[in-house]
Curated annotation (Swiss-Prot):
Binding site for Mg(2+) 2: E73
GO biological process, one term: DNA recombination
UniProt binding sites for Mg(2+) 1: D13, D145
GO MF annotation, one: magnesium ion binding
Alphabetical UniProt keywords: Cytoplasm, DNA damage, DNA recombination, DNA repair, DNA-binding, Endonuclease, Hydrolase, Magnesium, Metal-binding, Nuclease
Function: The RuvA-RuvB-RuvC complex processes Holliday junction (HJ) DNA during genetic recombination and DNA repair. Endonuclease that resolves HJ intermediates. Cleaves cruciform DNA by making single-stranded nicks across the HJ at symmetrical positions within the homologous arms, yielding a 5'-phosphate and a 3'-hydroxyl group; requires a central core of homology in the junction. The consensus cleavage sequence is 5'-(A/T)TT(C/G)-3'. Cleavage occurs on the 3'-side of the TT dinucleotide at the point of strand exchange.
The name this protein goes by in its record: Crossover junction endodeoxyribonuclease RuvC
PROSITE patterns xref list: RUVC
Known EC number: 3.1.21.10
Organism: Magnetococcus marinus (strain ATCC BAA-1437 / JCM 17883 / MC-1)
Gene: ruvC
């Protein structure tokens, strides 16, 4: 892939009842939404069936939208251990889907995503939705989980951009006798 080709990233906000996702093409500073949405699951279904649905639907999305990379939100461990375990399972189903399709997978905490997108690591859900609408030039605010998926993809693209700009400079400094 040439350096002038956009990188397509799918961002995943895993959940055992609703999994949000967003696909963004990034080229330099430019980012454009490809598609976004949610995978809504019946909470009355047994967890293994919901995990299968997350996996199958993400594989289908990856096949259709052809992202180059995947970014997934890390599990936030709350006081409710059962919820954290279910979230971890949903996250695992998403990661396996990406790995099965051969995608490199990056992981970010919710705080990293919020800080990268809003500039504040404790931003509220509605702030994230509005920021996604503004930054990605959307007609309306995306659903919360879809906005999170878009934000995760955007965070990853921003991290890639930052590494591409700073890493060559660091290497160049080392080659000139600088220190790491």
């Amino acid at each position: 892939m040439s350096s002038a080709s956009p990188i397509r990233v799918i961002g995943i906000d895993p959940g055992s009842n609703v999994t949000g996702w967003g696909v963004i093409d990034g080229l330099g500073q430019r980012q454009q939404v490809v598609e976004y949405g949610t995978i809504r699951l019946d909470g009355k279904e047994p967890l293994p069936m919901r995990l299968h649905q997350i996996h199958a639907q993400l594989v289908s999305l990856i096949q259709r939208l052809q992202p180059h990379e995947m970014a997934v939100e890390e599990v936030f461990v709350s006081q409710n251990v059962q919820s954290a375990l279910k979230l971890g399972h949903a996250r695992g189903a998403a990661i396996v889907a990406g790995a099965q399709m051969g995608l490199p997978i990056a992981e970010y905490t919710a705080m990293q995503v919020k800080k990268a997108v809003v500039g504040y690591g404790r931003a509220e859900k509605n702030q994230m939705q509005e920021m996604m609408r503004m930054l990605l030039n959307l007609d309306k605010k995306p659903a919360q989980d879809a906005a999170d998926g878009l934000a995760i993809a955007m965070c990853h693209l921003n991290q890639r951009q930052w590494h591409q700009q700073t890493l060559p400079a660091a290497i160049l400094g080392l080659q000139r006798g600088g220190r790491a």
